[in-house]
């Protein structure tokens, strides 16, 4: 990063725990859990997120390998002027203006905004980064030939752990570092024993989880752990990202127990009866994860577009 870029970036502020209030007005417009306030704060040290307000538009920089932009805006926001300012800033720093986490439904908006300042856009999306979306009724359904795999997995799980149970994290300000949260860390430790840090290409997920707990919001988040007796087996964390969608943002089945991942997702949905869609996130191009997520029959995959302004 050159001196000009460093000078420019001083205008932007690191995302901290106290910034939640600045992001809240945009929560109902969230398309992806990757870029809610909680996700940005949790992954802050890995992606060096920084933000700045441009009128009623919140601009977040993601600084991993290249600098890119995530836009937060409301219905009716006029981003023409914002795009013009960003384009000039990036041009001055000899950088290409690139937006990430753009939904397909937003492409025309970005196209029209770019044209309003005399520019064009190009865009692309990777299957590796696309989120798997499930209609909750279909995800819970065990009937029919297509759901045979779900039934086989659950039957295998019940034979191995007939007394399997689930516990939900009941948050208060005094128990953030004990109770089932410690069991989540234990499951992480088990998972780490069979993986190397070099394979965690986005950084240490356990440390990301620690930061997430700092901003846990009981109104938006649910943490559940599965147990065989007193032994923790797996855990999952869901985040409500809009009025009808919950997204699984952390999930670990350290012992790779057959049927357990689906069972825990299913039990959490059965306790949350006003959700229409479940987002299980991306597969990162890992074939085993792709096979598992397809086996639950997604209703569609939600692409995350990268938009470049030229």
Which sequence ranges carry the predicted segments?
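Amide-forming acyltransferase catalytic core, primarily the GNAT-like/NAT-type
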Residues: 2-56, 200-201
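Conserved donor-binding loop and adjoining core beta-sheet/short helix segment
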Residues: 35-106, 227-255
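Short, glycine/charge-rich beta-strand/loop segments that flank catalytic centers
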Residues: 96-113, 127-132
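Short catalytic-loop micro-motif centered on adjacent basic/acidic residues
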Residues: 98-100, 167, 277-280
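Conserved active-site alpha-helix within GNAT-family acetyltransferase domains
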Residues: 106-123, 152, 284-301
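Acyltransferase donor/substrate-recognition loop-hinge adjacent to the catalytic core
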Residues: 116-197
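Short, conserved active-site entrance elements at the starts or edges of catalytic domains
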Residues: 171-231
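Aromatic (often tryptophan-rich) hydrophobic motifs at membrane interfaces
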Residues: 220-310
